[in-house]
Amino acid sequence: MTTTISLLRHGLVENPEAVYYGRLPHFGLAARGRAQAIAAGRYLADANISAIYHSPLLRAEQTAGLVAAQLSAPAPLIACDLLTEIYSPYDGQTIAAMEQRNWDFYGEIAPPYETPADILARVLAFFAHARAEYPGRHIVAVSHGDLIAFAILWAFGRPATGAAKRELIDCGVDDLYPAPASLSTFRFDADGALIEYRYHCPHDDK
């Protein structure tokens, strides 16, 4: 018996002020992001999805709903705090300011903000929860880029660090970082051991 968990990054966000939105409320999907989510849903339409978990943030909730609407059989939508965006001090900073930092979220932080190890612990706790709730099934979990990035590094036995996050191409992530509405799929055996990982971006399909 194997359990499959597909981590899906939310679609592209409407962000006219060009800020790092992080956990800020009211940031929903752009039209392109909705199309990306629909493409992911169509890709998963016949995958026998048993449930769609999602971060409580609006962009993830909207992505989950659009995916669910494409499935050939209904699947419950379940909000889960373990999937929410990283807790950092940079919410609301401009994209320009973040680019000057080289998007370094972790080099100068202290509690209560999250470290990569904290974030990975959340992802692994979610994996354990999902396997217990839906053993032998396939579920989708809509989350955020760094959570998915650290899960990928874990799958390849690499350290969860900000530096390692920049080397995801070595883990099969052709986009260098989990693309909007991309799928990172993890398959576990009955004992919870990871037996397969794959990355795919449905809206890139021709």
Pin down the residues of each PLM region.
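Extreme N-terminal starter segment of soluble prokaryotic enzymes
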Residues: 1-6, 51
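Acidic, low-complexity terminal tails and accessory targeting/binding regions
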Residues: 2, 73, 78, 85-97, ...
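Beta-strand elements within well-structured catalytic alpha/beta cores of enzymes
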Residues: 4-8, 137-143, 147
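Loop-to-helix element that buttresses phosphate recognition and phosphoryl-transfer chemistry
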Residues: 12-62, 113-120
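Short active-site segment of divalent metal-dependent hydrolases/proteases
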Residues: 13, 147-148
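Phosphate-coordination/substrate-recognition cap region in phosphate-metabolizing enzymes
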Residues: 38-107
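Active-site catalytic microenvironments for nucleophilic, acid-base chemistry
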Residues: 43, 66, 70, 129, ...
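Internal catalytic-core helix/loop-beta-alpha segment
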Residues: 108-135
